[in-house]
């Protein structure tokens, strides 16, 4: 039986295993034929959306991996707007509204509120937090 999952990522792109475990879990789900309705990045997890992350050449580029996965499987990558702004992750619209020089949110990621997470949770068979 194929299930629909929502993933909640609260860990940063580097420094803990939360985000990388979420990514590997997502890949495994998709390979088994399950569906991911949404990946929601909250708290420190919003750092996964920062396009200015520049890992060493011998390190796994997790933000780019999320983008590739989302592109391949058409998965929304939602980023909590309040958590993102507190941590300096902004899209073009927020950069303009806040009077900032530029944005740093990677493509495929989009700002949204906790309401988007709540809506997704109502339709998913499983919600898994990392």
Curated annotation (Swiss-Prot):
Cross-referenced Gene3D superfamilies: DsrEFH-like (3.40.1260.10)
TM region positions: none
Source species, domain of life: Bacteria
Pfam family, one: DsrE
Gene Ontology annotations of biological process type: tRNA wobble position uridine thiolation
Residue numbers annotated as active site: 80 (cysteine persulfide intermediate)
Name of this chain's protein: Sulfurtransferase TusD
Native source species: Proteus mirabilis (strain HI4320)
């Amino acid at each position: 039986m194929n299930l629909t999952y929502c993933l909640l990522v609260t860990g940063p792109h580097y420094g803990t295993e939360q985000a990388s475990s979420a990514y590997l879990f997502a890949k495994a789900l998709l390979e088994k034929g399950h569906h991911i309705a949404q990946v929601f990045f909250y708290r420190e997890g919003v750092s996964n959306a920062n396009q200015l992350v520049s890992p060493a050449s011998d390190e796994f580029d997790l933000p780019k991996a999320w983008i590739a996965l989302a592109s391949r499987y058409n998965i929304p990558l939602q980023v909590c707007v309040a958590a993102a702004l507190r941590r300096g992750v902004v899209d073009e619209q927020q950069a303009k509204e806040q009077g900032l020089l530029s944005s740093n949110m990677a493509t495929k990621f989009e700002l949204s509120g906790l309401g988007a997470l709540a809506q997704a949770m109502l339709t998913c068979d499983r919600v898994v937090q990392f």
